[in-house]
């Protein structure tokens, strides 16, 4: 009998498409049957035909849509739609759901039984989407990776030992047993390392009634990264509390701690840890404190050239005050530390009061303020003034007493740096006036104000040009004389970034206190008058600086609107 008569439909199509010769096709078909594999899987594993070629051919021949799995956000796959047993048995994967219709990825278009079984099991209308077989296998493994999978080799992470808080001995021993559970140790280590590698700033470990989830804040946005079994909740919490030196038996009150992770022989990263009792257990949030972020240099922060020169000039002044303002998470600490690093030489005495100290810097005297123990910002400032300081940094000006001491220091031969939670440079000045700071003292002590936000940077690998009508550009505030001289880009998403953005860049309003602004302050002018004068003197506000970043192709207009529009 002729070999070609023995060929299945797919084998015949491969021969007709010159992807296989007849002899190889017959042998592959027989080998797949012996190994109890689908022909598609055998061909890909044997490297006889690529997964992409098979998918494209099958899509054309069977009239089924093809989709590249790597272009999809695998975190959004409806994992619970199909049981793991059924997924692995039929080698299918749930991609997305629309109403009562479930779309599943398959690599073998002839596997009609898979679609029938999925439809029967879920009660949903099921539509097949062709995907590449090699990518399908990886995606299935990733989808059902459990809390203890893929963690081998992480036990050797060097976590500095910390004493456990004084708890009841029996409770302590029970909790310690939970905390030392090997799979939990590996899972926690993996989460910490993944957060560091992904450039995340915060980790959230969150218990709920029926689920436990872990989320990372990356580039300012929270996203879910893991859903370990709910049964691991108490053990994960115990492990994190042991590492942070917290009292494991205390589950009714918030606690604060710290973890130091050594990621190489020369580099370690600190995590600030906070626990919060919730309805379903303790939520734990960790802030990553990477000292290298404060040593990137001013050029890496995103200042426009004229803004950078204003900051550097202010740092060279022998006395006065530099204020950095913005909401929580806007990068104020990094801006301050960057300035302190520039000033950190052997002939300058620098002291800082912080709540808490986030980044340890050699050569700088850093103090943790703790009002409950009698050390608040104002008391730290008074102590600094008796320590022969050149530069003083106050983590935040929160009250009139701290503001008055800081201003007095700035007027008596010291450089003072601090932050406020205000929206703009103009609002910073009026906030201090409203606190009760005398207008004359404020006008003569403040040298520079920096208001800032952090915007996500477009991924350079996948950003695409975005056409925007002229009327829209004018409405958004782009300069009329610049329209037509620049291109705007929008996010796409690729393997490098996942969502179209990678990293963040600062958007700044840098205002020098000029004689004209001093007059308005001494007359106790409002924020509108101050902002108008700053614009007249050529200082870009946050909105204008953000539009410049969009015109330069660094970020998108949508992102500028997100961080600068009230």
UniProtKB/Swiss-Prot annotation:
Changing residue 331 to S: Complete loss of pili formation. It is found in: Cytoplasm. CDD domains: PulE-GspE-like. InterPro entries: ATPase_typ4_pilus-assembl_PilB (IPR013374), P-loop_NTPase (IPR027417), T2SS/T4SS_dom (IPR001482), T2SS_E_N_sf (IPR037257), T2SS_GspE_N (IPR007831). Changing residue 109 to A: In strain: PAK. It comes from the Bacteria. One of its GO terms (molecular function) is ATP binding. PROSITE patterns: T2SP_E (PS00662). It holds the Pfam family T2SSE. ATP binds at residues 326-333. ATPase component of the type IV pilus (T4P) that plays a role in surface and host cell adhesion, colonization, biofilm maturation, virulence, and twitching, a form of surface-associated motility facilitated by cycles of extension, adhesion, and retraction of T4P fibers. Acts as a molecular motor to provide the energy that is required for biogenesis of the pilus and the extrusion of substrates generated in the cytoplasm. PilB ATPase activity is also essential for T4P extension while antagonist PilT ATPase activity is required for T4P retraction. NCBIfam families: type_IV_pilB. Belongs to the GSP E family. This is Type IV pilus assembly ATPase PilB. It comes from Pseudomonas aeruginosa (strain ATCC 15692 / DSM 22644 / CIP 104116 / JCM 14847 / LMG 12228 / 1C / PRS 101 / PAO1).
């Amino acid at each position: 009998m002729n070999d070609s008569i023995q060929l299945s439909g797919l084998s015949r199509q491969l021969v007709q498409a010159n992807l296989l010769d007849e002899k190889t096709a017959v042998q592959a078909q027989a080998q797949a049957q012996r190994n109890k594999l689908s022909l598609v899987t055998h061909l890909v594993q044997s490297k006889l035909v690529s997964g992409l070629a098979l998918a494209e051919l099958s899509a054309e021949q069977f009239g089924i849509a093809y989709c590249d799995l790597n272009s999809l956000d695998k975190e959004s796959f409806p994992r619970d739609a199909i049981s793991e047993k059924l997924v692995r048995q039929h080698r299918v994967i749930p991609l997305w759901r629309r109403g009562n219709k479930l779309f599943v990825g398959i690599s073998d278009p002839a596997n009609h039984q898979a679609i029938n079984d999925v439809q029967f099991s879920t009660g949903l209308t099921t539509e097949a989407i062709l995907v590449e077989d090699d990518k399908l296998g990886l995606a299935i493994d990733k989808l059902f990776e459990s809390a203890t999978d893929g963690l081998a080799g992480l036990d050797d992470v060097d976590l500095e030992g910390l004493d456990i808080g004084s708890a009841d001995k029996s409770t302590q021993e029970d909790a310690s047993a939970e905390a030392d559970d090997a799979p939990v140790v590996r899972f926690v280590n993996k989460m910490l390392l993944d957060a560091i590698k992904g450039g995340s700033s915060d980790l959230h470990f969150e218990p709920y009634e029926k689920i436990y989830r872990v989320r990372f804040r990356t580039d300012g946005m929270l996203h879910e990264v893991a859903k370990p079994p709910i049964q691991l909740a108490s053990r994960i919490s115990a492990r994190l509390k042991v590492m942070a030196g917290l009292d494991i038996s205390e589950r009714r009150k918030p606690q604060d701690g710290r973890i130091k992770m050594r990621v190489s022989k020369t580099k370690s990263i600190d995590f600030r840890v906070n626990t919060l009792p919730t309805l379903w257990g303790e939520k734990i949030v960790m802030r990553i404190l990477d000292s290298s972020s404060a040593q990137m240099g001013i050029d890496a922060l995103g200042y426009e050239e004229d803004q950078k020169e204003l900051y550097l000039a202010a740092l060279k002044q022998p006395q006065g005050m530099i204020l950095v303002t913005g909401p929580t998470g806007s990068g104020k600490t990094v801006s301050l530390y960057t300035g302190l690093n520039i000033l950190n030489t052997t002939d300058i005495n620098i002291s800082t009061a912080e709540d808490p100290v986030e980044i340890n810097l050699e050569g700088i005297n850093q103090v943790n303020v703790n009002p409950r123990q009698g050390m608040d910002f104002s008391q730290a400032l008074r102590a600094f003034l008796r320590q022969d300081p050149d530069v003083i940094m106050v983590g935040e000006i929160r009250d009139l007493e701290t503001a008055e001491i800081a201003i007095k220091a700035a007027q008596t031969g010291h450089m003072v740096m601090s932050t406020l939670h205000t929206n703009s440079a103009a609002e910073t000045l009026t906030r201090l006036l409203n606190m009760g700071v005398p207008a004359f003292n404020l006008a003569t002590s403040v040298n520079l104000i920096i208001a800032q936000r952090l915007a996500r940077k477009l991924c350079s690998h996948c950003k695409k040009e975005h056409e925007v009508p002229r009327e829209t550009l004018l409405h958004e505030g782009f300069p009329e004389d610049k329209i037509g001289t620049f291109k705007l880009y929008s996010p796409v998403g690729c393997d490098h970034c996942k969502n179209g953005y990678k990293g963040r860049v600062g958007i700044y309003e840098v205002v020098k206190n000029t004689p004209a602004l001093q007059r308005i302050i001494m007359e106790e002018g409002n924020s509108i008058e101050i902002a108008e004068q700053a614009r007249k003197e050529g200082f870009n506000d946050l909105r204008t600086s953000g539009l410049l970043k969009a015109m330069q192709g660094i970020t998108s207009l949508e992102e500028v609107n997100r961080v600068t529009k009230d």
